[in-house]
């Protein structure tokens, strides 16, 4: 049996939010506005779909932080480290609503956001607009969820930067 590969070019809308707040202030604000994914939810997800899991997912925040990675420390390999953290942000229930129609959309669920220290002492937040990521799968149900995420993520990140 042989494998096949296909490629296509997709258009992605990239968003940059610039803030006069310091990296530490924006990071702190983001982490207070968007809670970390509940440990109990992680356990329930690991154990499989149950009634308790569904109840918890339906009551969960619209967005949660799944993971974070300190990219600023990596800069220490080449220069002085800076404040830079990448986040995976999303919602397990929302992800399942997307991937049930297009499993490939799991590439982008949860979403990635980076917050970093700008050269001027302020900070920047960058991310790809969810609807533009999900539009490539050609399923309006998936893109529609992406539009809702555009709003939710945009509000949270703008509030953190503001």
Predicted regions and their residues:
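Charge-rich, low-complexity N-terminal segments
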Residues: 1-58
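Short, surface-exposed beta-strand/loop "edge" segments at domain boundaries and coil↔beta transitions
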Residues: 25, 72-75, 94-97, 135
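Conserved short hydrophobic interaction patches
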Residues: 33, 37, 105, 152, ...
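Helix-adjacent hinge/juxtasegments
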Residues: 57-90
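Short, internal acidic amphipathic alpha-helical interface segments
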Residues: 82-119
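A structural preference for long, well-packed, hydrophobic secondary-structure segments
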Residues: 96, 105, 121, 130-132, ...
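Beta-strand/loop substructures that line and gate deep hydrophobic ligand-binding cavities in soluble
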Residues: 114-137
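Well-ordered alpha/beta subsegment
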Residues: 137-162
């Amino acid at each position: 049996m042989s494998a096949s590969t296909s490629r296509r070019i997709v258009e992605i809308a990239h968003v940059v939010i610039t803030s006069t707040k310091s990296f530490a202030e924006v990071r702190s604000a983001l982490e207070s506005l968007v809670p970390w994914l509940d440990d109990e939810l992680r356990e329930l997800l690991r154990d499989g779909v149950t009634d308790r899991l569904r109840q918890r997912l339906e009551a969960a925040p619209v967005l949660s932080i799944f993971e974070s990675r300190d990219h600023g420390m990596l800069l220490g390999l080449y220069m002085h480290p800076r404040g830079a953290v990448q986040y995976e942000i999303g919602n397990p229930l929302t992800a399942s609503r997307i991937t049930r129609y297009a499993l490939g959309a799991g590439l982008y669920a949860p979403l990635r956001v980076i917050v970093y220290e700008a050269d001027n002492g302020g900070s920047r937040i960058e991310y790809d607009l969810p609807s533009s990521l999900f539009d490539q799968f050609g399923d309006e149900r998936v893109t529609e969820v992406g539009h809702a995420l555009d709003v939710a993520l945009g509000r949270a990140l703008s509030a953190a930067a503001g």
